[in-house]
Amino acid sequence: MYGNHVLLRSLNPLAVARGDDIPDAVTIDGVSLSRGDILGAATSVAERVAQADRLAVLATPSVKTVLAVVGCLIAGVTIVPVPPDAGPAERAHILRDSGAQAWLGAAPDDTAGLQVLPVRQHARSWHSYPDPHPSSTAFVLYTSGTTGPPKGVLLSREAIAAGIDALAEAWQWTWKDTLVHGLPLFHVHGLILGLLGPLRVGSPVIHTGKPTPELYAAAGGSLYFGVPTVWSRVAADADSARALSGARLLVSGSAPLPVPVFEKLRELTGQAPVERYGMSETLITLSTRADGERRPGSVGLPVAGVDTRLVGEDGAVLPHDGDSIGALQVRGPMVFDGYLNNPEATAESFTADGWFDTGDVAVIEPDGFHRIVGRASTDLIKSGGYRVGAGEIETVLLGHATVDEVAVVGLPDEDLGQKIVAFVVGTGVEPTVLIDLVASELSNHKRPREIRVVDSLPRNAMGKVQKKQLS
């Protein structure tokens, strides 16, 4: 049962019975659970759900979510995490498409006619279950749906194990660490890395509920996860940032970390943050290493087992020269098994020779470091015959004192094809000054043709700017 391939290795009942337990394996919503607590309560959940195929979990940051997820993994039941803030249409789509048979743990007011199975924190069972096959589906994670209804990403147990192990090696992540984060538990970042990662590696995890600078500072961890919005707020709170100076790694992901935030964190904490890259379909495929260079604007090198390549519009593989911008394609053991009920989308996502097309465009340096330009659909702007990456323009603009946030997009233009437009949040913004700044720092054809000052930028639950809403 508990061989090398068991997903949640630190919950080995034999080892826990021998005394390999810790009182604070998971701390969430003000409650600390030991390994024994998690194992006993989650096995009780497993007994109640073992005959199910797929169950929906309303993924609140709570003990119920932790026990529901672990219980399903013990029983071999596929988990369908549902965002707590999902609207009626999105939630109905997820339930219908996934075929979830019931809610497990918490449930929304509108259960869509599905039964709600309880999760009891203090229930205990020590029944022994055979470990499910490594290739079996652990999760159906729904994408953000920027190109239509959300698609269900099929993630196997072995893909998750490979992804966590590769990051543990790159980050030198061990049982001696204490992970701190306050990320949502329905995405790869918060759920796979932020919950299953510690339960596989054996390190305690503290979920802060909300990822505020004050809560991060008070947690006293050695390893911190955050999205750029979180790190931007930490960098703006000097006292909280300095309180993290004793941490071993500050990891940023889910969106590009602005270079000014990178530099401010380095100044205040004494260490540069670690950046990584991934997506629901691939987990994390690129990362700066704990013992390697931390280069602003870069997401580092392929993790163990991952290969990458850049492909041009003509299908040719591009060189790693630091200049060529191409479609980023990846392959590795952590890549998903396809989209649920959508063989056409699955086929379109893979090349004939087996590479997954991420939909992102990137540049690879001669030394193998990767820089993500952005989404091919929104961040690669084709203006006046030039191919321009939105990210480098955003970096320049964020360096100006009047700019707090910025998103650069290409909007239709009869003359240029697309014109470069910058949406800026700031105080005392002077459009001509910003346009001239980009022209002088980069080149004239990369300058925004228009600066639009706005009160805020549209973002999703992970803090990613939703550029398709900007027009």
Give names to the regions the model predicted:
Residues 57, 103, 332, 337-338, ...:
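AMP-binding/adenylate-forming catalytic core of the ANL superfamily
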Residues 31, 46-86:
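Conserved AMP-binding/adenylate-forming
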Residues 161-178, 186-222, 237-238:
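Conserved AMP-binding/adenylation subdomain of ANL enzymes
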Residues 5-9, 22, 124-142, 149, ...:
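Conserved pre-ATP/AMP-binding loop-to-beta segment of ANL
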Residues 221-226, 235-295, 307:
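Gly/Ser/Thr-rich phosphate-binding loop
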Residues 309-329, 348, 366-367, 428-431, ...:
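Conserved beta-loop-beta connector loops within the AMP-binding
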Residues 32-36, 138-165:
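Conserved AMP-binding A3 loop
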